[in-house]
């Protein structure tokens, strides 16, 4: 991946890559640069801090952070940066991701984590949300978002037409 990136995707374990890759796919669709890596709030806190500290010099504008179970990674990142942090709860325990959802969303005032849905749909939405944030200062990304939303609407119209023809 590029040295200068728009978005840094962090995940607590490499087992989260199958979910978090959906965020990267969304970012790529909008022409954004990104990097994905593993950093654990519990097992490698020094690595987490180094990645946060290096981010401004790399051009990072948004963090997308996925973790399961206790899921403290997004909160730790949010506590140490003023950049937007989007949290993706991951289903990795007997609680089916609800523990990760609550750990990610329940942040104290002044330390926000924008939290999306559990799992791959949430990771996709994290990529789209990051693009929307970055688009505030980049008209070419805003234009790609308009096209993306139009494609979503066109799919709904096509589905409605197919159902209408079956009736």
What is the meaning of each model-derived region?
Residues 51-93:
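Glycine-rich phosphate-binding loop
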Residues 16-20, 44-48, 67-76, 95-98, ...:
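Short glycine/serine/threonine-rich phosphate/pyrophosphate-binding segments
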Residues 2-43:
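Glycine-rich phosphate/diphosphate-binding loop of Rossmann-like nucleotide-binding domains
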Residues 23-29, 53, 80-82, 131-132:
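Short, solvent-exposed amphipathic alpha-helical segments in soluble enzyme
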Residues 5, 11-18, 22, 98-167:
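C-terminal binding/interaction regions
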Residues 36-57:
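N-terminal beta-loop-helix "entrance" segment that forms/cooperates
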Residues 6-11, 35-37, 63-65, 86, ...:
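Short glycine-rich or small-residue beta-strand-to-loop segments that form or flank ligand, phosphate
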């Amino acid at each position: 991946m590029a040295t200068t990136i728009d978005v840094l995707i962090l995940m607590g374990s490499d087992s989260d890559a199958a979910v978090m890759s959906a965020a990267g796919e969304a970012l790529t669709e909008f022409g954004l640069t990104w990097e994905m890596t593993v950093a654990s709030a519990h097992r490698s806190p020094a690595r987490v801090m180094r990645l946060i500290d290096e981010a401004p010099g790399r051009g990072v504008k948004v963090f997308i952070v996925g973790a399961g179970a206790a899921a403290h990674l997004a909160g730790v990142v949010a506590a140490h940066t003023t950049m937007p942090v989007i949290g993706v709860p991951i289903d990795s325990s007997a609680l089916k991701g609800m523990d990760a959802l609550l750990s990610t969303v329940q942040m104290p005032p002044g330390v926000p984590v924008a939290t999306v849905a559990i799992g791959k749909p949430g990771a996709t939405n994290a990529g789209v949300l990051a693009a929307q944030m970055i688009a505030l200062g980049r008209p070419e990304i805003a234009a790609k978002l308009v096209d993306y939303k139009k494609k979503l609407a066109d799919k709904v119209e096509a589905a409605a037409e197919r159902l209408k023809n079956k009736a």
